[in-house]
Amino acid sequence: MNSKPSKGKLMKQFTLFILILMLTSLACGQSGPVTPFPTLENPASESGKTIYGFFPSPPKATLASIIGHYKDLGQYADFILFQHNIPWADFVASAEGESKSRTDIANQAMLARQNGLDYIFVVDPLNGLNRREFMNLPSGWEASFANPQVRAAFTNYTLWVVRTFHPRYLGLASEINTYMDAYPEDAANFVSLYHEVYGKIKLEAPDTQVFVTFQWDDLNNMFEGAAEGRQKLQPNWDQIEAFEPNLDLWVISSYPYFIFPGASMPADYYSRILARTSKPVAVAEGGYSSRDVGGVTATPEDQVAYLTAIHDQLGSRLAFWVYLLLNDFDME
């Protein structure tokens, strides 16, 4: 199955590098108990309005750039999206305990709070650059959602996030349809895990809005060689509806700049989701290049057309909207 376009991969690869630097810089190699988190007086996620956010994406790989970036986010965003990979070994036995991974994640969340930012969490068991792979599984672990170790660590990590950070919105995997396409024999195992963990979350935090994200362009069979013979622009609704009735909102990612110029985007490319569900919708990841990259032609006007399409087609029911980057990276 084909992966996402090179520009998207480049942006996400650098974002992952930045996240690793942030974890290392903020934690200073220490582990210890996670202290209680300050609550925002008026959290954006409780406003009842569409909220806007970004991935953490400082322009330079320096601590000063990270600190400055969070200050900028505090001015321009309502929230930051944290999409950490699961620290498998730290959580296979229990949700409780102390570890460097817990401290690292908590320090990032604290920095967000200090800058007046709400946060949304997405639990991510897979490789962000290749959704056919698990990320950093311990040696000897079977890469399958049927594996009891995988299921235990996934569950315990998710419950730790719920108990520690109390997020209003919580995702239980990203772009999961790409994994389901690659490993249809394992799809039912993830679906059952999702339903199990959803139930556990609701017992502890019934107001938490739980979802899983779907790669919209792939769901619409727009990738050449990755459609498995399915018709373009005919969404694979069965992949979303396998998670019902336990989707509190329908959430997508989309990078359409390599499929069609912004001006030629179908008028109902996104809005067709509104006709399929009465639930709120959200964009958990996305972007559109403003210049030609790797053989893909794009302009600032195309980027504006993409933003306008999201706004006009989904705006009436949009719970939150994440654009991948607040700023370009300084690659020097």
PLM feature spans:
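Substrate-binding cleft of secreted/luminal carbohydrate-active enzymes
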Residues: 282-332
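Alpha-helical scaffolding within the catalytic cores
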Residues: 62-70, 103-107, 154-158, 216, ...
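Aromatic- and acid-rich polysaccharide-binding/catalytic face
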Residues: 82-84, 165-168, 172-174, 214, ...
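Aromatic-lined carbohydrate-recognition surfaces of secreted/lumenal glycan-active proteins
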Residues: 172-174, 193-232, 280-291, 318-326
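Active-site groove signature of glycoside hydrolases
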Residues: 157-187, 211-213
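N-terminal substrate-binding region of glycoside hydrolase catalytic domains
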Residues: 36-152, 171, 175-177, 251, ...
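Short, well-ordered coil/turn segments that N-cap beta-strands
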Residues: 46-50, 76-78, 115-119, 166-168, ...
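Ser/Thr-rich, Proline-interspersed low-complexity disordered segments
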Residues: 19-46
